[in-house]
Amino acid sequence: MKLKMLLLSSTPPGSPGGQTDPDTSSKTPTTTTAATDTSPRRQSINKQSQQTETKRRGYGRRPSSRTRRPQTHQRRSRSRSRSRSSSQTHSSTTTTTTTYRSRSTSLNKTRARSRSRSTSRSTSTTSRRGGRGSSTRQRSRSPSTYTSKRSREGNTRGRGRGRQGRAGSSGGREQRRRRRSFSTSPDSSKRVRRESPKYRGVSPSEVGKQLRSVGAKHSGRLGRLLEEARDPPVILVRGDANTLKCFRNRARNKYRGLFRSFSTTFSWVAGDSIERLGRSRMLISFSCLTQRRDFDDAVKYPKGVEWSYGSLDSL
């Protein structure tokens, strides 16, 4: 608009384009004055700015560089981003803590419920176990409670066992006492001692079973007497010396395994003289009575030969 006003004012009044209304011609000088007034003001403002610049240069101060402004902007942006991230992390931690707390409270509630249920059911089970003679046992009314019992057994075993063990400890202790009394009773210990071969007596049929003589063992008087009572069995054969020698040679080959050893022929002599008393004799030793019986059943003694059973303390 200012340019239009200047163009209108610069055209002369006698030119064809300059013929205008009287109202416009009267207004033109005011606009020119305004335009002329604005130009010296701008010049004065520019001069003042130049003077301030020269004054600053005189003191030796320099204007701040433009590179520091974006750094402040970057710092502000970083601080804003940090504040945002910290606020976000704080909010996330608060949310996670709230979720953990809610879960822990729910778990505690469920545990408390399971404890109360396990205690009530453990008391019922102990009351059922207390009566062993009772044939009828109550069962759960609904299948849902039966399945829930099985699912909760794993959680309530460790806690329910303590109270069940306290309630049923008296029965278990009584059973243990009965077992201990049965195992450590004097009758059972006597039976075991009676059955042991060390404390057995020697029956008449067992006399003569042992082959070797009793050595110098530190088994005591009783053990020594019992060992001496078991003497090896023997058969004493009486007859002519030649017949006994022939019988011995045949029996060694024919009846192997049915005897232990044969002795040479001998004869008894009286104490006052050197004369032989009776016929010559021979001993046949055995390891046990059964062996002697088997030998006696299998052997055929020659004519004119007599025999008799006996036992010796040692051979």
Swiss-Prot record:
GO molecular function: DNA binding; DNA-binding transcription factor activity
Compartment(s): Host nucleus
Compositionally biased region (Basic and acidic residues): 188-198
Name this polypeptide is given: Protein E8^E2C
Provenance organism: Human papillomavirus 47
Compositionally biased spans, kind Polar residues: 41-52
Lineage: Viruses, Monodnaviria, Shotokuvirae, Cossaviricota, Papovaviricetes
Chain spans, region Disordered: 1-215
InterPro entries: E2/EBNA1_C_sf, Nucleotide-bd_a/b_plait_sf, Papillomavirus_E2_C
